[in-house]
Regions:
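A short, aromatic/hydrophobic, helix- or strand-capping loop or linear motif
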Residues: 21-23, 67-73, 108-118
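Short, solvent-exposed aromatic-acidic interface loops
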Residues: 48-52, 102-104
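A generic structural signal for nonpolar/aromatic side chains embedded in well-ordered alpha-helices
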Residues: 10-11, 56-57, 102, 133
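Helix-adjacent hinge/juxtasegments
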Residues: 53-89
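Amphipathic alpha-helical interface surfaces
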Residues: 7, 53-56, 94-98
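Short beta-strand segments
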Residues: 14-49, 65-68, 78-81
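Charged, gly/pro-rich active-site loop segments
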Residues: 77-135
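Extreme N-terminal tail/first-helix region
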Residues: 1-16
Length: 135
């Protein structure tokens, strides 16, 4: 099994990615978020705009991430470690694509599918935060 095969298997089995972000002063913050990926090069998650990591990404888009299985015995764990630049999705086609990625992943995990209605988080909040990640 190649390293790429191992990484893909970890991403396929993972439900959460741990995001490491920093605020404008460089103060770090790590948070697990449910993620979806379709092509192993772009990760998507939907975030509340007030979430600390969303606010951090708005001022400092450089992030680090790790996906791993925390249930395996000590000394046997494997993970996928990544650095990337995160960005809020604003293009309607990109948002629709990302929601589609989420829907397919949700169904794969035995949950309901997502529709475009999920792209409207809160009508009283001036902006939604949809984050796409590219290496």
């Amino acid at each position: 099994m190649t390293n790429d095969d191992i990484a893909r298997a970890i991403l396929d089995a993972g439900i959460y990615v741990v995001l490491a972000t920093a605020d404008v002063d460089g103060v770090p913050w790590a948070s697990p978020v449910w993620f979806a990926t379709e092509n192993y090069r772009e990760l998507y998650w939907v975030s509340y705009p007030g979430a600390r990591y969303s606010q951090n990404i708005a001022v400092r888009p450089q992030i680090a991430m790790v996906v791993f299985d925390s249930t395996v015995p000590a000394g046997t764990g494997q993970g996928v470690y990544m650095t990337a630049t995160a960005e809020q999705l604003s293009d309607p086609a990109a948002i629709e694509y990302g929601i589609g990625v989420f829907s397919r992943e949700s169904v794969r995990q035995g949950n309901e599918g997502w529709g475009i209605e999920y792209s409207i988080l809160d009508p009283d909040v001036p902006q939604d935060v949809r984050i796409g990640v590219r290496p």
